[in-house]
Amino acid sequence: MSPRKSPFFELRSGAVDTLLFVVKTTDLAEMRAELTRRFEATPEFFANDTVAIDVRRLAENERVPLAEIATLLGSVRMRPIGVVADSTQHGWANEAGLPLLDARDPRGGRNHGDEAGEEAPGKPGAVAPKPDAAPPADAASNAQVQMQLPIAAQEDGAPQAAAEGVRIGTSSQTTVIDKPLRSGQRIYAKGDLVVLGMVSNGAEVIAEGNIHIYAPLRGRALAGVHGNHDARIFCTCLEAELISIAGIYRTTENPLPADVHGKPVQIWLDEEKLMIEPLRLT
């Protein structure tokens, strides 16, 4: 006999939408300096975002004080929720008092890159409370720390709206949003996403396919989030906080050129580089 469902709570298996903070050095001073350099101009950018500390890039004999790293992340207003570690690291990783998490390839299974045990550069990962960790993510640069962008969690394959009053029209692989998105709202589409209103600062649109925005883009736009390198972003006015395709991203810390800022543009990937080109609509 199966237990009767409780009207008060429910326990379910699920994934968590979070960032991965990939540690590649044991030098906390260098790590602190790099965080300051990258985020001091935009202190609110990752404010209150959850983050998992990923230590799988460290050598077998290297350890880091995870409690101090958690405090360091808190200083830039991130919220550490756990640690991603190899099985050989579990002993010391447990000492920080943070839960051990599993970062999996969002397409399912393990993602093997060009070298054994590595993923391709810049790919995001969904985080879930499982003990068997996936291989470490490779780095696209020589930076001391690496931020990976999140995959939005979802249930039953349905597109998500983070607030009431947003109308979602879905036709096969295309999701249409006919209202402006305010700060804090988030939309996820399994295929292409079309937005007819403004995406405000602090709002976020995420799609596994292309993103089309027929209004100013001032928040975040993440296309091709399951590793689709052919995805593109189109918008009629580019003023974005962040743009990303297949996990390769650009933020406001790198100002947009004058010929594309506030202009109609298309954005795509050329190998591992984001390309931004003005759209000539007339």
From Swiss-Prot:
Domain of life: Bacteria
Biased composition (Low complexity): 122-140
Sorted UniProt keywords: Cell cycle, Cell division, Septation
Gene Ontology biological-process annotations: cell morphogenesis; division septum assembly; regulation of cell division; regulation of cell septum assembly
Residue ranges, compositional bias (Basic and acidic residues): 102-115
InterPro entries hit by this protein: CAP/MinC_C, MinC, MinC_C_sf, MinC_N, Septum_form_inhib_MinC_C
Binding partners and assembly: Interacts with MinD and FtsZ.
Protein name: Probable septum site-determining protein MinC
Species for this entry: Paraburkholderia phymatum (strain DSM 17167 / CIP 108236 / LMG 21445 / STM815) (Burkholderia phymatum)
Taxonomic lineage of the native organism: Bacteria, Pseudomonadati, Pseudomonadota, Betaproteobacteria, Burkholderiales
